[in-house]
């Protein structure tokens, strides 16, 4: 199994797809990396030579921010928004949708499971 950026790449998949197992690399970026290294996207990971794996590793770790560094940068960006008190930062802090979606209905993924609010009780009947 090839190991790139601290991630074990699956052996039986095409290299184009296998690279997407690295956080921060999608299909488009995977194709760009393969074009830079000159590797055929249809090659299976198990068929890569050590030189090709080394070339992939050099491009991924040298030119792109992936895995832990990328996660850390995203967390710091969100923390910065919260610290300077922006509207987006406040939405992150309250676990509400950040990009202007409605919250009266929907937004269940972001808000979590419903918190049931008891209805107003009727006053007991007087005789």
UniProtKB/Swiss-Prot annotation:
Q: What is the protein's quaternary organization?
A: Part of the 30S ribosomal subunit. Forms a loose heterodimer with protein S19. Forms two bridges to the 50S subunit in the 70S ribosome.
Which SUPFAM superfamilies does UniProt cross-reference here?
S13-like H2TH domain (SSF46946)
| UniProt cross-references to InterPro entries, sorted A to Z | Rbsml_uS13_C, Ribosomal_uS13, Ribosomal_uS13-like_H2TH, Ribosomal_uS13_bac-type, Ribosomal_uS13_CS
Q: Which family does it belong to?
A: Belongs to the universal ribosomal protein uS13 family.
State the protein's purpose: Located at the top of the head of the 30S subunit, it contacts several helices of the 16S rRNA. In the 70S ribosome it contacts the 23S rRNA (bridge B1a) and protein L5 of the 50S subunit (bridge B1b), connecting the 2 subunits; these bridges are implicated in subunit movement. Contacts the tRNAs in the A and P-sites.
* Keyword flag rRNA-binding: yes
Which parts of the sequence are annotated with region: Disordered?
100-127
Q: Which GO terms describe its cellular component?
A: cytosol; small ribosomal subunit
**What keywords does the record list, in alphabetical order?**
Ribonucleoprotein, Ribosomal protein, RNA-binding, rRNA-binding, tRNA-binding
Query: Which organism is the protein's source?
Result: Synechococcus sp. (strain JA-3-3Ab) (Cyanobacteria bacterium Yellowstone A-Prime)
What high-level taxonomic lineage is stated for the organism? Answer: Bacteria, Bacillati, Cyanobacteriota, Cyanophyceae, Synechococcales
Q: Which GO terms describe its molecular function?
A: rRNA binding; structural constituent of ribosome; tRNA binding
Supply the name of the protein. Small ribosomal subunit protein uS13
Q: Name one GO biological process term.
A: translation
Basic residues compositional bias, start-end: 101-127
Q: Which PANTHER family match?
A: 30S RIBOSOMAL PROTEIN S13/40S RIBOSOMAL PROTEIN S18 (PTHR10871), SMALL RIBOSOMAL SUBUNIT PROTEIN US13M (PTHR10871:SF1)
């Amino acid at each position: 199994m090839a190991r790139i950026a601290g991630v074990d790449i699956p052996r039986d998949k095409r290299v184009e797809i296998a690279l997407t197992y690295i956080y921060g690399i999608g299909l488009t970026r995977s194709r760009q990396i393969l074009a830079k290294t000159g590797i055929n996207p249809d090659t299976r990971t198990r068929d890569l030579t050590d030189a090709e794996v080394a070339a992939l590793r050099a491009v991924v770790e040298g030119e792109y921010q992936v895995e832990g560094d990328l996660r850390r940068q995203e967390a710091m960006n969100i923390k910065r928004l919260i610290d300077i008190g922006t509207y987006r930062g406040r939405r992150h802090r309250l676990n509400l949708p950040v990009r202007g979606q409605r919250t009266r209905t929907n937004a269940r993924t972001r808000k979590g499971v419903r918190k049931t609010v008891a209805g107003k009780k009727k006053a007991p009947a007087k005789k």
